[in-house]
Regions:
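Short, conserved sequence motifs used for protein processing/export or organelle targeting and
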Residues: 349-582
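Intrinsically disordered, low-complexity Pro/Gly/Ser/Thr-rich segments with frequent PxxP/GP/PP motifs
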Residues: 251-279
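Beta-sheet-rich sandwich/jelly-roll-like modules and their strand-loop junctions
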Residues: 23-108, 149-206
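Residue-level detector of functionally pivotal "anchor" positions at catalytic/ligand-binding pockets or at interdomain
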Residues: 41-65, 197-219, 311-320, 570, ...
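Short, solvent-exposed loop/linker segments at the N-terminal edge
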Residues: 216-222, 424-428
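Short, well-structured beta-strand segments enriched in hydrophobic/aromatic residues
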Residues: 129-166, 284-291, 445-454
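Local sequence-structure signature of Cys/Sec-based thiol-disulfide redox active-site neighborhoods
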Residues: 314-349
Length: 631
């Protein structure tokens, strides 16, 4: 059975400034592809109006929370900057039994209605229903929200479609006992297919607003191209622009010739890029652009936008963390097991897997003191604490889509470099950890999180068997999903409960409770600059469980050190290494009275003559490398 719900999707082409919200909304299968959705006959008052919206009119999907009898509010943002009125709506109909339907306009999502119209049926599925306001409403310069409210009779009653875009989808829902509150889901789902009908449009010769500026994260002295989006409401075609670029007070004028002319009309979208060389000093730089001319004519309005460029001392690899919510009692969790095992096998240098077993307390690997990270069901995962995903399907419905989700998140350049060494103490009652955190840009506020995980965990005991619902399905019913077919009928794991070998299982951490992390915190007040290194040490007590002790003695325990941004909650970078056994930390041996150490380096790779506090990297005469921590 293929998974048809998306928990959250976040595009990371540009750095995000707020933490992604968790959501109860789910998307059903896209069943209406290739259909041009019919528009009911317009009222006379809607003649000569122009539809505006973000969603597709040819490919609809449906969204809901999987329950009926729910009251939904759905809205889009209609930008200002255009002299026009809103005369009515094209209301997309999925649920023919919906009740208490109204359309409305508001200056804020929680504000009073500027205009409202009740709507009665009959409602025809897969059609736009046109609704006219009694009087046109003037579109204000600051824009407004256009939406509709209804009580559903189907589980997935909201029409969505097209490419995700800012302003495209705002949602609220309520039941008799609960209200979700408004949320911006524009970067998690396709936009609403709702349209407003604009009338009395008066275009200026030239009118433009910037919609985005994707300032990059990059190394010092590096060439860049920055994309800028805009919306034109101009009576003339646009061929070229003149802009002033201000980076941290340094202003440069640039002439931009558009790759394709922007046609005259309302809400015409375009994009251009401008290039340059990043500053020679690491830091955070405001990038502001202001529009000066269009087609050589001085621009009389005001159009500008700002982004933040992060300039790093150097580029280092990112290790991306996938934290999975799972448990032996979860019948659909075999797909999470398949996805995590695939990532571990195929991305050993960049994947940090952490499986926290909290689904059922009867699970021998159950670990209480770990945050659920907003995940409400298993299997589920969070990638770098930025985006929720399915640990097999990722952000969509594709087999092993977790790979694409991981690669997308792994593209972002980290602001810190992390080097780690860890060892069991002599009696193996605790793991001693040393981490060197190099700041590639001056830190603002961050925390360190330490997590012990164990590999190769298995047992023939009944309590260790993994529940499996997929044994009821054929391979075709899971779209012949690699690895997943093994749990289906006639597969090697095609039984209701199966023996597995579990990896990346949490057995200890710096969390003293599910919400309290005991790891170190570093802020801007500590005085660290770009290029400086924070030396951290930490100790985690060993698990008292027999199976965890066995994993430790067999050398199957890893330590992951994560650096979390305290403002966003995102993981900035991480490093996962194997915990060395006590014998690995004895003094460097010598042969025939001669040491086999040939060189010693600090965490930054600089040669040092004597041991220094923190992580020391020792190169041996035989070419091997050892990591030693000095407290």
């Amino acid at each position: 059975m293929k998974r048809f719900s998306i928990i959250a999707i976040i595009l990371l082409v540009a750095s995000l400034s707020v933490k992604a919200q968790r959501t109860d909304f789910q998307k059903s299968e896209w069943q209406k592809s290739g259909t041009t959705h019919r528009v009911a006959k317009k009222a006379a008052s809607l003649d000569d109006t122009m539809p505006f919206g973000y969603g597709s009119t040819t490919n609809w999907g449906t969204l809901g929370i999987g329950s009926t009898g729910v009251t939904f509010d759905v809205a889009i943002f209609v930008p200002g900057g255009l002299q026009a009125t809103i005369n009515g709506f094209n209301l997309p109909v999925i649920d023919t039994g919906m009740k208490n339907v109204s359309v409305w306009l508001r200056s804020s999502l929680t504000g009073e209605n500027l205009a409202e119209k009740s709507v009665s049926g009959p409602f025809v599925a897969d059609e736009y229903m046109t609704v006219a306001f009694d009087e046109p409403v003037t579109l204000p310069a600051e824009g407004l929200y256009a939406g509709y409210t209804f009580t559903c009779s189907t589980a997935y009653p909201i029409a969505i479609g097209g490419e995700m875009t800012s302003g495209g989808l705002y949602l609220n829902y309520s039941t008799s006992t609960y209200s979700s509150g408004w949320g911006d889901y524009s970067d998690q789902f396709a936009p609403s297919t709702l349209q407003v009908l604009l009338g009395n449009i008066a275009l200026s010769d030239y009118q433009m607003e910037f919609s985005y500026l994707n300032a990059p994260t990059l190394a010092i002295n590096t060439a860049y191209e920055i994309p800028v989006g805009f919306v034109s409401n101009s009576a003339n075609d646009i061929n070229d622009l003149d802009i002033a670029v201000n980076i941290n007070g340094q202003i440069e004028n640039k002439h931009i010739t558009l790759a394709s002319p922007i046609k005259s009309g309302a809400f015409q979208k375009g994009e251009f890029t401008f290039d340059g060389i990043s500053p020679a000093q690491a830091g955070r730089y405001d990038v502001n652009i202001a529009l000066k001319k269009i087609n050589g004519v001085d621009y009389e309005g005001e159009a500008q936008t700002t982004g933040l460029m992060k300039n790093l001392t150097r580029i280092v690899p990112r290790q991306t963390v996938i934290e999975e919510f799972t448990g032996t009692g979860c019948g659909y969790c075999p797909r999470g097991w398949v996805g995590m095992e695939y990532m571990k096998a195929n991305y050993p240098e960049s994947f940090v897997g952490i499986a926290f077993h909290k689904y059922n307390s009867s699970d021998p690997m159950y670990y209480e003191n770990y945050p659920t990270l907003g995940l409400t069901g298993a299997p589920g995962c969070v990638i770098d604490r930025k985006a929720e995903a399915d640990p097999y399907y990722g952000f969509g419905n594709d087999n092993l889509g977790i790979v694409d989700a991981f690669n997308l998140m792994n593209q972002e350049l980290p602001e810190v470099d992390v080097k780690v060494a860890a060892q069991w103490n002599d009696d193996m009652t605790a793991v001693d950890i040393a981490a060197d955190i190099e700041f590639l840009i001056a830190p603002e506020s961050l925390s360190l999180i330490y997590v012990l995980t164990a590999d190769s965990l298995t047992s023939t005991a009944t309590s260790w068997k993994q529940s499996n619902y997929y044994y009821q399905f054929t391979a075709a019913q899971v779209d012949n999903g690699p690895g997943l077919v093994d749990f289906c009928k006639n597969g090697k794991y095609g039984k209701s409960s199966v023996k597995l070998t579990f990896n990346d299982v949490v057995i200890g951490s710096s969390y003293l409770s599910s919400i309290r992390n005991d790891g170190q915190t570093i802020t801007s007040e500590d005085g660290y600059e770009a290029g400086s290194i924070y030396h951290a040490t930490y100790s985690i007590p060993a698990s008292t469980k027999a199976w965890a002790k066995s994993a430790a003695k067999n050398g199957h325990v890893d330590i992951s050190v994560m650096v979390e941004d305290n403002f966003t909650g995102y993981i900035m970078n991480a490093r996962k290494v194997r915990v060395e056994l006590p014998a690995a930390v004895i003094p460097v041996p010598s042969h025939n009275g001669t040491t086999n150490q040939t060189a010693r380096y600090n965490a930054a790779g600089q040669a040092i003559a004597t041991p220094q506090r923190g992580l020391n990297i020792i190169r041996m005469a035989d070419g091997s490398v050892k990591k030693v921590m000095i407290k």
